[in-house]
Swiss-Prot record:
Organism: Candida albicans (strain SC5314 / ATCC MYA-2876) (Yeast)
Record's protein name: Small ribosomal subunit protein uS17
MF-aspect GO terms: structural constituent of ribosome
Pfam families for this protein: Ribosomal_S17, Ribosomal_S17_N
CDD domains assigned to the protein according to its UniProt record, in alphabetical order: Ribosomal_uS17 (cd00364)
Annotated function: Component of the ribosome, a large ribonucleoprotein complex responsible for the synthesis of proteins in the cell. The small ribosomal subunit (SSU) binds messenger RNAs (mRNAs) and translates the encoded message by selecting cognate aminoacyl-transfer RNA (tRNA) molecules. The large subunit (LSU) contains the ribosomal catalytic site termed the peptidyl transferase center (PTC), which catalyzes the formation of peptide bonds, thereby polymerizing the amino acids delivered by tRNAs into a polypeptide chain.
Organism lineage: Eukaryota, Fungi, Dikarya, Ascomycota, Saccharomycotina
Domain of life: Eukaryota
InterPro entries linked to this entry: NA-bd_OB-fold, Ribosomal_uS17, Ribosomal_uS17_arc/euk, Ribosomal_uS17_CS, Ribosomal_uS17_N
Length: 155
């Protein structure tokens, strides 16, 4: 995932829609920041409260609400900007052979700059309104991935 170097990296001026940025304000005052609690037992990360990033698609500091399904999966790809691909494994029953077969689905999810996500991490995502053509989920919690010894590796 690309790291956020500066807040003002886009062509348009980036600001939170709920906060008035007064150019005449004293420089020593702490800047105001708007954030919210998404509910459902998920804590707002410290980076969302104290950070300086601007992300309108963030569930904690943006305008997106979480409703619907809550899913868990393993991060497979972090190559896109602020978007990850998670893999959800499941078993499908085949009645003819009276056995189960392994299957998986890939789900694209928006990841807020409040989280540092790497491949192999286990993330919990919540459903939100469609953010783009394929993205309908938002990362709510990041858990550390499985240790290297437990994972499959060639050597």
């Amino acid at each position: 995932m690309a790291t956020e170097l500066t807040v003002q990296s886009e062509r348009a001026f980036q600001k939170q829609p709920h906060i008035f940025t007064n150019p005449k304000a004293k420089a020593n005052k702490k800047t105001k920041r708007w954030y919210k609690d998404v509910g459902l037992g998920f804590k707002t990360p410290k980076a969302a409260i104290e950070g300086s990033y601007i992300d309108k698609k963030c569930p904690f500091a943006g305008t997106v609400s979480i409703r619907g399904k809550i899913l868990t999966g393993t991060v497979v790809s972090t190559k896109m900007h602020r978007t990850i691909i998670i893999r959800r494994d499941y078993l499908h029953y085949v009645p003819k052979y009276n056995r189960y077969e392994k299957r998986h689905k890939n789900v694209a999810a928006h990841v807020s700059p409040a989280f540092r996500v790497e491949e192999g991490d286990v993330v919990t995502v919540g459903q939100c309104r469609p953010i783009s053509k394929t993205v309908r989920f938002n990362v709510l919690k990041v858990s550390a991935g499985a240790s290297r010894s437990k994972k499959f590796s060639k050597f």
